[in-house]
């Protein structure tokens, strides 16, 4: 008997168009219908490294552009001047390791776990030789006050002098923003409290 059903994602729905083009060219025909077959992915090494990397960089550049626009709109609506806005968004670095966290802001997902050691985080995010930046997005349930407080906390930390232009939180999270984040970040952050998370589908996309 079936004792459980694990949730998952539909690969082709979330696959970036330029990556799909590469897969269509280098993977076996009808690969979309054989995603679960090992031999399908044995051909992944046929894709030249540079082409695969260029496809990722293309998506990352689109994400950077989206972040700039989203943050600018949010700051303008908050009455923040353009000089201050430019000071923040111009620090976005397409060459930095970009780490993404986007999902429902439930407490067990621990969105603010990395803020437990502010001193260490400050050191990591301000290393000129190994640039790192974080981008957050998501919504909390209207009745989830603690989840809403997580969003508020991230916003407050993003305004701290040492984190300006290093930590971003996007407003009005939706499927469109999700697509940009999933395909554009370098690393997807997933650190839920065990065993509360079902499967972490936000990053599987």
Please give the residue ranges for each predicted region.
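Catalytic cores of carbohydrate-active enzymes across secretory and cytosolic contexts
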Residues: 1-205
């Amino acid at each position: 008997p079936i004792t459980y059903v694990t949730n998952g994602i539909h690969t082709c729905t979330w696959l970036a168009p330029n990556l799909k083009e590469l897969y269509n060219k280098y993977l076996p025909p009808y690969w979309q219908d054989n995603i679960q077959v090992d031999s399908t992915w044995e051909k992944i090494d046929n894709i030249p490294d540079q082409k695969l990397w260029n496809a990722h960089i293309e998506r990352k550049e689109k994400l950077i552009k989206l972040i700039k626009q989203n943050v600018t709109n949010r700051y303008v609506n908050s009455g923040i001047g353009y000089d201050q806005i430019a000071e923040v968004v111009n620090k976005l670095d397409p060459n930095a390791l970009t780490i993404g966290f986007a999902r429902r802001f439930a407490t067990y997902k621990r969105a603010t776990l990395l803020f437990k050691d502010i001193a260490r985080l400050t050191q990591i995010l301000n290393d000129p030789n190994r640039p790192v930046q974080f981008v957050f997005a998501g919504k909390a349930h209207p009745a989830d006050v603690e989840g809403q407080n997580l969003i508020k906390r991230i916003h407050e930390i993003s305004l701290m002098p040492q984190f300006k232009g290093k930590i971003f939180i996007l407003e009005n999270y939706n499927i469109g923003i999700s697509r940009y984040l999933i395909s554009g970040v370098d690393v997807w952050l997933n650190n839920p409290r065990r065993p509360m998370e079902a499967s972490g589908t936000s990053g599987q996309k």
